[in-house]
Structure formats: C-alpha cells, structure tokens
Amino acid sequence: MISSSPATGILDRLGKASSAEEFFSLLGVEYDPKIVNVARLHILKRMGQYLAQEKFAGAAEPEIRTRCKAMLERAYGDFVASSPIDERVFKVLKDAVSDSKKAAAFVPLSELK
C-alpha cells in the first residue's frame, strides 16, 4: 500500500497505485467487489478518460482529491448501470462493433473444393 505522506499529492499516489482496489481505497470510494472483479480495467480506463478532460493546474490538493473521487465514482457508476461490452472503453471492443457492420463475405458452395 502507498504511504499517505502529505508531501505526496493524490495524483502522484494514484499514479503509483497497483490495483483498482487501491484507487478506491485512496479516494475513499465504496464499491462492490463483484463489479470491480469483472470491470476493474474498464473502470480505471474510463476514470482515465474523465481525468484527461480535467484541468488541475492551480487547484488545491483537497479540490483535486474531491474531483478525482467524483470521477472514480462516475466511472464506477457507469459499470454498475451497464456492462463492459455495452460501454466499450477499449479499442478492441469498439472495433468489434464496427467490424460486425461490414458486409459478411459470401462464398458460394460452387467455389468450395
């Protein structure tokens, strides 16, 4: 577990976290282990997408922590209400949808040897 040194900011501590559970612990977010076990990477990826939209420059540490907590709660909520397949945060899942929209290749029986 990462120490809670006041000199280390929450973003640094999150960057060093080694598990999804550690993110939840650092930010004090309650979670259902069954949901995290199924969607841990998806939740963290979605949180990363939310973090990428944020501007933290000049923000005080308590505000940064509060905003990070809200983003993790929002990302977690996305997967409480939906599934990783429905949310499609990873490229491989997005591509699976676009590939299925392509016309299926047709091979007539007469072409088979």
UniProtKB/Swiss-Prot annotation:
Please name every pair of cysteines joined by a disulfide bond in this record. none
What are the protein's UniProt keywords?
A: Nitrogen fixation
Coiled-coil spans are: none
Q: Does the keyword Membrane apply?
A: no
Output the GO biological process annotations, alphabetical, semicolon-separated. Answer: nitrogen fixation
In Pfam terms, one family for this protein is: NifW
InterPro entries linked: NifW
Role played? May protect the nitrogenase Fe-Mo protein from oxidative damage.
The family line of this record is: Belongs to the NifW family.
Question: How does this protein assemble?
Answer: Homotrimer; associates with NifD.
Query: Sorted alphabetically, which HAMAP family does this protein's record hold?
Result: NifW (MF_00529)
| Protein known as | Nitrogenase-stabilizing/protective protein NifW
**What species does this protein belong to?**
Bradyrhizobium diazoefficiens (strain JCM 10833 / BCRC 13528 / IAM 13628 / NBRC 14792 / USDA 110)
